Design a protein with these regions (language model features):
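Conserved catalytic cores and adjacent C-terminal regulatory segments
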Residues: 1-382
Length: 382
């Protein structure tokens, strides 16, 4: 009897300690932005409202999204947005606010996705790679000296996937890899160009790292990781150097931004006769990847679903305002989705409350701000 009482007291204290740890420990914050489409309306609407709410709830008119997230991931058009809001302006601050980034994408969209001049008998629609290259170089360079920024030149860890035809496997660009070796450091415009090389619209993009030792023949990252959230979660869980306090998903706070889900009507219409265009197949694959990842993460965070928030639009909203007013969707643990009472706008508001309560990110700035000595060199010196 006495033993049972002692055991109960021990477990009660352990439970209190665990609950106290869950309440007080600072979670690692992940922002993930889907690929898909060329306008980024859903992600753009969410980013604008996210930044607006951060500034409103902190009372800081200069606060930016990168201040409150520990890592940002993006694919396709989402990768361009992710790179813009994390690129270092040279003083340790983001090169673009979310408002500026969305404005640039909107203003230069016709140049990013400019139709390529083709012959009279060419039936396949292609986009101009030269035009996209020019815009990306212009956008992802330092304003003062025109320096083309690299993965190391980011104020927060960045993660962007593509599919490498040379190795027939996904290739994930990261600041962590870039800081370890110049062979894994790539210019940001090339990284964004790689993840947006949709097979039906662009030819594969061939490029090398800054030291010329690593080469890649890339196509759209959306084919394998249109929703890069799982890649970001895995990266954080296995990167103890940058995220030493993370032991499991219970230590994470995740915001995943979709880029609009197809209703499927158009795809069925095109494919009913047994013929599918390349673009149709790519869209179906990308949507399938995004939904699968969302379902997996819904299961992983089922014990505390408020730690994982997915913002998506079901093809109904055509403007940013309509996207934010749509009711949110939540993946259920054993399949299916539930329509929530809260709108996408309200869900972002609630998420920002938790962000602000946990304070600004305490991760170190861009590796380029420090000595050129790598962690490996430091370890060897010891």
């Amino acid at each position: 009897m006495e033993l049972s009482k002692v055991t109960l007291e021990i477990f009660s204290k352990l439970e209190q300690k665990w609950l106290s740890h869950c309440e007080t420990s600072k979670k690692t914050r992940i922002l993930s932005i889907d690929g898909g489409g060329t306008t980024g309306i859903v992600a753009g609407a969410a980013l604008l409202h996210l930044e607006q709410q951060i500034r409103l709830q902190t009372g800081d008119s200069d606060a930016q999204i990168a201040d409150f997230f520990d890592i940002v991931a993006g694919t396709g058009i989402g990768a361009i947005l992710a790179a813009m809001i994390t690129a270092d302006d040279g003083s340790g601050r983001p090169l673009y606010t979310a408002k500026d980034a969305v404005h640039v994408i909107t203003e230069k969209n016709s140049e990013l996705y400019k139709p390529k001049t083709t012959g009279v008998f060419c039936r396949r629609r292609r986009l101009s790679s030269r035009s996209m290259d020019s815009v990306l170089k212009q956008v992802l360079q330092r304003r003062e000296d025109g320096k083309l920024l690299t993965l190391k030149d980011t104020c927060k860890p960045l993660l962007i996937p593509c599919f490498d035809l040379k190795s027939s496997a996904p290739f994930v660009f990261s600041r962590a890899g870039a800081s370890e070796s110049p062979s894994f450091n790539f210019e940001l415009w090339k990284v964004c160009r790689a993840t947006t090389a949709t097979p039906s619209l662009f030819k594969p993009f061939h490029f090398t790292s800054v030291d010329g030792k690593t080469s890649c023949s890339a196509v759209d990252g959306g084919l394998v990781m249109n929703n890069p959230t799982a890649a970001a979660v895995t990266h954080v869980l296995h990167n103890k150097r940058d995220f030493p306090t993370v032991n499991g998903v219970e230590d994470l706070l995740v915001l995943s931004l979709g880029n609009g889900a197809s209703s499927g009507t158009q795809a069925r219409k095109i494919c009913d006769n047994g013929e599918c265009s390349t673009s149709c197949v790519v869209d179906i694959a990308a949507d399938g990847v995004s939904e699968t990842i969302d379902q997996m993460l819904g299961n992983a965070f089922c014990w505390n679903h408020t730690d994982y928030v997915r913002i998506q639009a079901m093809g109904l909203g055509r403007t940013r305002e309509e996207v934010l007013k749509e009711r949110g969707l939540e993946s259920l643990a054993f399949g299916g989705k539930r329509l929530l009472k809260e709108s996408n706008e309200e869900r972002i508001d609630s998420f920002v409350q938790r962000l602000v309560a946990s304070g600004k990110s305490s991760l170190p700035p861009s590796p380029c701000k420090h000595s050129a000595v790598t962690p490996l060199a430091v370890a060897e010196a010891r």
